[in-house]
Amino acid sequence: MRLLVLAALLTVGAGQAGLNSRALWQFNGMIKCKIPSSEPLLDFNNYGCYCGLGGSGTPVDDLDRCCQTHDNCYKQAKKLDSCKVLVDNPYTNNYSYSCSNNEITCSSENNACEAFICNCDRNAAICFSKVPYNKEHKNLDKKNC
């Protein structure tokens, strides 16, 4: 019985850890829209204390603060009535957006949850584009957080 409960928790955790490839690719696409020369999944994953899975401690710089704000935005989204756990949550929900001339527009056809999540990702991508990238903070040992 304990193994069954553990398996269920791991399945839920995997879904909430951002493993939905389409949702991840949407955020990736927004970052590429604002920073065309970037490789978002390589550049920003495991940067500082907040960029990537999880996050804790004190952000190490402005870019890390962008990630902390993004994490907090997702936490707010999960509290919305329109964002149901496991159905419409920030880590698994897909939304519609467009990119033109390095400008991101979230579609007016998104439902309330999709619109909120789209704007979380949009604001993070804009934030990333406005702050410096410090290579010393990539793969930072989390004990420094």
Swiss-Prot record:
The enzyme's E.C. designation: 3.1.1.4
Catalysed reaction equations from the record: a 1,2-diacyl-sn-glycero-3-phosphocholine + H2O = a 1-acyl-sn-glycero-3-phosphocholine + a fatty acid + H(+); 1,2-ditetradecanoyl-sn-glycero-3-phosphocholine + H2O = 1-tetradecanoyl-sn-glycero-3-phosphocholine + tetradecanoate + H(+); 1,2-dihexadecanoyl-sn-glycero-3-phosphocholine + H2O = 1-hexadecanoyl-sn-glycero-3-phosphocholine + hexadecanoate + H(+); 1-hexadecanoyl-2-(9Z-octadecenoyl)-sn-glycero-3-phosphocholine + H2O = 1-hexadecanoyl-sn-glycero-3-phosphocholine + (9Z)-octadecenoate + H(+)
GO molecular function, one term: calcium ion binding
Keyword presence, Metal-binding: yes
Free-text comment on the cofactor: Binds 1 Ca(2+) ion per subunit.
Signal sequence coordinates: 1-15
Pyrrolidone carboxylic acid modification, residue list: 16
GO cellular component: cell surface; extracellular space
Subunit: Monomer or homodimer.
Stated name of the protein: Phospholipase A2
